Amino acid sequence: MERRTKIVCTLGPAVASADGILRLVQDGMDVARLNFSHGDHPDHEQNYKWVREATDKTGRAVGILADLQGPKIRLGRFKEGSTVWETGETVRITVDDVEGTHDRVSTTYKNLAKDARPGDRLLVDDGKVGLVCVSVEGNDVICEVTEGGPVSNNKGVSLPGMDISVPALSEKDIKDLRFALKLGVDFIALSFVRSPADVELVHAIMDEEGRRVPVIAKLEKPEAVAALESIVLAFDAIMVARGDLGVEVPLEEVPLVQKRAIQIARENAKPVIVATQMLDSMIENSRPTRAEASDVANAVLDGADAVMLSGETSVGKDPHNVVRTMSRIVRFAETDGRVPDLTHIPRTKRGVISYSARDIAERLNARALVAFTTSGDTAKRLARLHSHLPLLVFTPDPSVRSQLALTWGAQTFLCPKVDDTDGMMREVDRALLAMDEYQKDDMMVVVAGSPPGVTGNTNMIHVHLLGEDTRIPK
């Protein structure tokens, strides 16, 4: 059986060629991530084209995710490029545009002096350097260095616990979003989500561009953790972005946030990605640490739809080895069968039908579950149940097929639009009897809507024996 948990790979200089990306697809990449925190539009456009070319060559459906930078707060530039702050020193972070010195440097967050209060923490470079606000003098925030270390131009600053006043989309994000939509990406990931309402700003831009695609909420802020259930309901998918999350909330809370996010996302049939530092040591090394292997396996056993690679594939020494290694770890974890069952009992029509179809298929010892879908919803509702049976998904929409590349276990087939149930069964027979894995009279449990092609109309479970419809055109 194919690997069920999907792999997201971040593109970058290490794979920036047609052959490099083709090999990633062949190694097992299911979704390509364009990271708009780095690179420029021509770079992303070229990578996009290479992914689509690789999809055409291999026949594999590979989704493309545009990850917006978000309102990232950064230090300004230092006159010398960098400095080292020692523990116990006093430094000034100013909203004035100044050339940075050892003692005083600017920030991109122009409301810092208004929002900061004595006792507030400022964490630089993913928490490697720690500051605490002592006082505010005019446009300067006076800080004591609590954890010293090197700092350099444009390093990121996290403000855990501070009520900051920044929009969900920066001007750069809006430009990047419009560009990505015109390009044709399959997903948008929104950084530093704080509230369910943040998705409305993205939808407004999408409506102006005349194109809506799924929006992924990145869990990185304490506010997002507090509003987790409402954010899951508002967005189309979730990413547990453990890097920034581990800076913003206490480190020991991150594993439990991950488990809770996966559980809530599964209950609502929303795909969930676990991201950041999964095989981080493989940026330099040919083998992961044992802890990293356990981390990947535990994400699989928690029930994640996908696991994500960042620097490992974008700038790592051997990105192809990384993907193959992750795929091996995932496959072995999946053989264990310990993903907890969905304790949430569905109450909606589509939820109950998918739940019943899973039970029928497993009790009848069917060869596979089959879904016909125009939106992808039926497939996601079946996927969250994590049946041991293959999940074969038929759709007439190429974009839906690409979007299902993020959904656990979904093996997708592009098919023509059909007019009735007989047409569906003919498409199932045509596709599956051409494969070595399936033979005539194999039992399939098919979930669909009748009449076909109506979004949200899932209302049918059909037990089908391959080849029983003799009207398949020769």
Swiss-Prot record:
Pathway: Carbohydrate degradation; glycolysis; pyruvate from D-glyceraldehyde 3-phosphate: step 5/5
Keywords: ATP-binding, Glycolysis, Kinase, Magnesium, Metal-binding, Nucleotide-binding, Potassium, Pyruvate, Transferase
InterPro entries per record: Pyr_Knase, Pyrv/PenolPyrv_kinase-like_dom, Pyrv_kinase-like_dom_sf, Pyrv_Knase-like_insert_dom_sf, Pyrv_Knase_AS, Pyrv_Knase_brl, Pyrv_Knase_C, Pyrv_Knase_C_sf
Site positions for Transition state stabilizer: 218
Binding residue positions for ATP: 35-38, 74, 155
Single GO MF descriptor: pyruvate kinase activity
Catalysis performed (reactions): pyruvate + ATP = phosphoenolpyruvate + ADP + H(+)
CC cofactor: Mg(2+); K(+)
Residue numbers binding substrate: 33, 243-244, 276
Binding site for Mg(2+): 220, 244
Pfam family, any one: PK
Positions contributing to K(+) binding: 35, 37, 67
EC primary class: transferase
Enzyme Commission (EC) number: 2.7.1.40
Assembly and interaction partners: Homotetramer.
PANTHER family referenced in this protein's UniProt entry, alphabetically: PYRUVATE KINASE
NCBIfam families: PRK05826.1, PRK06247.1, PRK06354.1, pyruv_kin
Homology family: Belongs to the pyruvate kinase family.
Name assigned to this protein: Pyruvate kinase
Species name: Corynebacterium efficiens (strain DSM 44549 / YS-314 / AJ 12310 / JCM 11189 / NBRC 100395)
